[in-house]
């Protein structure tokens, strides 16, 4: 993180305030005339692994003090905006636990169906776009880590959240009015043959509409 901060156009920092993790920060995008906040961008550290009380091992999550900071800062922005939430997008590595909870068991393998522990799962008609190629890997499922998405719904600002972590998933689903996007891995040393990313276009005149371009290098370069 310190290395990235040395780059001229890096807009992140180690943390906006003292809290768990590294790189938790909020970036505000001004309107074209500079008179108001048009968009808010959240960068959250979803951390890496956790050791559980029962000696198990799993992926970590965004912690309570991080969520508390998000809610405090979100309210500050809303207060500056006449009490209305400033439309926001959010980025973090590990997806929210609710992704798994949206899966439904199906009878057999097929398109956008994945196998896990001998059973088959799909988003069914909840899949808006993209592909489900592997079972999502959210925070440790033996504990309840659903507070973060509930917090977004409570504050009313986050319109879309973007995750990595699952290297070959690139699906889009929506939960409680919030769009959740998985994005392909872009690095060299990872599994799967496809690499990609997303180009996000924000329009200050249409706060509720975000244009997403999904880019897959396998097809862009062929």
Model-derived regions: residue spans:
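Short solvent-exposed loop/turn micro-motifs enriched in small/polar/acidic residues
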Residues: 18-20, 164-165, 192-193
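Short, surface-exposed, charge-dense and proline/glycine-enriched linear segments
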Residues: 50, 114-123, 191-198
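Short, glycine/charged-enriched secondary-structure capping and boundary segments
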Residues: 1, 104-106, 175-178
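Active-site-proximal beta-strand/loop segments in catalytic clefts of secreted hydrolases
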Residues: 44-47, 92-95, 164-167, 183-186, ...
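Binuclear metal-dependent phosphoesterase catalytic core
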Residues: 26-38, 134, 139-140, 146-155, ...
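His/acidic metal-ligating clusters that form di-metal
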Residues: 40-42, 56-166
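Extended active-site neighborhood of metal-dependent phosphoesterases/phosphodiesterases
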Residues: 1-83, 110-111, 199-201
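Short catalytic/ligand-binding loop motif for oxyanion handling, primarily in non-cytosolic enzymes
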Residues: 50-52, 97-101, 170-172, 190
């Amino acid at each position: 993180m310190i290395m990235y901060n040395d780059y001229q156009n890096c807009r992140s920092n180690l943390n906006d305030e003292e809290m768990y993790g590294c790189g938790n920060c909020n970036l505000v995008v001004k309107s074209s005339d500079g008179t108001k906040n048009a968009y808010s961008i959240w960068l959250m550290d979803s951390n890496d692994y956790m050791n559980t009380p029962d000696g198990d091992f799993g992926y970590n999550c965004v912690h309570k003090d991080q969520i508390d900071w998000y809610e405090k800062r979100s309210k500050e922005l809303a207060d500056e905006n006449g009490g209305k939430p400033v439309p926001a997008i959010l980025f973090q590595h590990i997806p929210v636990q609710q992704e798994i909870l949206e899966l439904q068991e199906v009878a057999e393998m097929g398109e956008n169906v994945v196998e896990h522990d001998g059973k088959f799962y799909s988003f069914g008609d909840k899949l808006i776009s993209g592909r489900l190629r592997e079972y999502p890997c959210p925070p440790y499922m033996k504990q309840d880590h659903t507070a973060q998405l509930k917090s977004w719904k409570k504050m009313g600002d986050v319109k879309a959240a973007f995750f990595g972590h699952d290297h070959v998933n690139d699906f889009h689903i929506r939960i409680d009015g919030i769009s959740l996007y998985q994005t392909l891995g872009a690095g060299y040393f990872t599994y799967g043959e496809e690499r990609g990313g997303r180009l996000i276009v924000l329009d200050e005149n249409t706060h509720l509409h975000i244009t997403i371009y999904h880019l897959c290098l396998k097809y862009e370069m062929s």
